[in-house]
């Protein structure tokens, strides 16, 4: 799968790209932009398209989004000297991938921006994603946005703007991207090399975001969902096995995706309890297993689990909670068991 910096195609967001182009053509391009929308809909791909436009000037001799163009190749290969990217990196000491953008990265960025630009058309900072900034990094980035060096454009990708400080949001021009309509979604999925007729259950879960469908497919989400549902109707040993599985998903595909296996059960269980069986079912066993689960405890308690699960990725990534134990306790509560039993 192409990374956003390598992707020449953009689906469904022509209006947002055109708005940026008009601002650039006016000669009064705002220096800070916030690209918002659900994960997987193309925000980072758009950010790199906009970056290539800035780096090539307002009237380039060649299309900067043509893979054969010089600026496209430099951006794709990470060799464009006037492009600065803030994203999560591996911890140099431990080798493990960090889950936040740390202040040392922001300081390195600031130092680089005070050097003379290599090209003639300005410099670009891409932050992918602003959701991963910690408090210290937010403060450093805010200073950059408030007092930008001449010719610098900052493009912030953001999945949930309500979770980042208003001081940053208020200083940016916002491009709000929407989920793709079905026809555009299918074109984007086909272009990415995925089955032209993907599983309807995955399409339902993707919610108009091609990148999300790719991620769910690669993580084998539906298979894990089925085994998690079945384990919730089984013994403590079954729950323990499911906790091992979820810890494995967290390690390979991210704690957010592992937690989503549980939040999907909560959300769809609550919907089924109030509206009846859901179509399409995500897996064959879904309706009967959800009915059994929601029948064991009051619906308000079931819904109360949602808030707890929303905090779980943070606890796993930032507080370094033991994932197997955390997932076991969450599974036990969903199954209607008393809290406090350690994983077996």
Report the location of each language-model feature.
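Charged, glycine-rich active-site and insertion segments that engage polyanionic ligands
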Residues: 1-53, 59-64, 68-74, 150-152, ...
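AAA+ P-loop NTPase catalytic core and its hallmark functional loops
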Residues: 10, 78-122, 136
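Conserved alpha-helical scaffold flanking the Walker A/P-loop in AAA+ ATPase domains
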Residues: 18-24, 69, 73, 100-124, ...
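Conserved beta-strand segments of the P-loop GTPase G domain that flank and frequently precede/overlap
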Residues: 34, 86-87, 126-129, 155
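Conserved catalytic/switch belt of AAA+ P-loop NTPases
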Residues: 114, 139-153
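Loop/turn-to-beta-strand initiation segments
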Residues: 119-124, 149-155
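Conserved Walker B
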Residues: 129-133, 161
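Conserved D-loop-proximal element of ABC-family nucleotide-binding domains
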Residues: 135-136, 166
